[in-house]
A protein has these predicted regions:
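Conserved N-terminal entry element of GNAT/NAT acetyltransferase domains
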Residues: 1-16
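Glycine-rich phosphate/pyrophosphate-binding loop shared by adenosine-nucleotide-utilizing enzymes
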Residues: 5, 69-74, 92
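Conserved GNAT-fold acetyl-CoA-binding loop/helix
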Residues: 26-50
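A short helix-loop-beta-strand connector motif used in the catalytic cores of GNAT acetyltransferases and
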Residues: 49-63, 93
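Conserved beta-strand in the GNAT
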Residues: 64, 70-79, 98
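A short, internal acetyl-CoA/4′-phosphopantetheine-binding micro-motif in the GNAT/acyltransferase core
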Residues: 81, 94-104
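Conserved acyl-CoA
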Residues: 100, 111-127
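Conserved active-site alpha-helix within GNAT-family acetyltransferase domains
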Residues: 110, 122, 134-152, 157
Length: 160
């Protein structure tokens, strides 16, 4: 593995490569929390349709990290609003973010986040939000290093 990853806008030609990265990301999440991250057999097909819709939607965007002609990471973001009772402007929301395992801890994630942050700034957002599993210490640490802080806690329980 040599060379440096370059950040760019994703295109329809990236569909399969980003799909593979998404599958790797979901497997990583499933290992952290197998109860929550159970996928349907058609999950990839459904997600790829979502990817296509994101590329066509002005309120969403997809970035790719590429090294040596290979996709090594991707990020997705969208605009998001709070309920209308709050006096807060719309904010950016990070919907997906992944770097393939061999390229982690080499600065790719930090640079990909920098490109993501710049895209949100260009779109006029003053705040970003995201969700991260409490059972995923690696991702929690990464997002804290990127300047995020917890402001809400989601909880769950079985009805049984």
């Amino acid at each position: 593995m040599s060379g440096e990853a370059k950040m760019r806008r994703a295109t329809p030609a990236d569909r399969d490569g980003i799909g593979r990265l998404w599958q790797e990301m979901m497997e990583f999440h499933r290992e952290c929390d197998p109860r929550f991250f159970q996928m349907k057999p058609e999950a990839l097909e459904v997600w790829l349709k979502h990817f296509d819709e994101c590329l066509a939607d002005q309120n969403q965007f997809v970035l790719a990290a590429e090294a040596n002609g290979e996709l090594v990471g991707f990020a997705m973001g969208r605009s998001s609003d709070d309920p209308p009772v709050f006096d807060r402007p719309a904010h950016g929301f990070v919907t997906n973010f992944a770097v393939t395992e061999p390229w982690r801890r080499k600065g790719v994630g930090q640079r990909l986040f920098g490109a993501l942050l710049e895209e949100f700034r260009k779109r006029g957002f003053g705040e970003l939000r995201l969700s991260v599993s409490a059972l995923n210490p690696a991702s929690n640490g990464f997002w804290r290093r990127m300047g995020f802080e917890a402001y809400s806690v989601s909880m769950r329980r079985s009805t049984g």
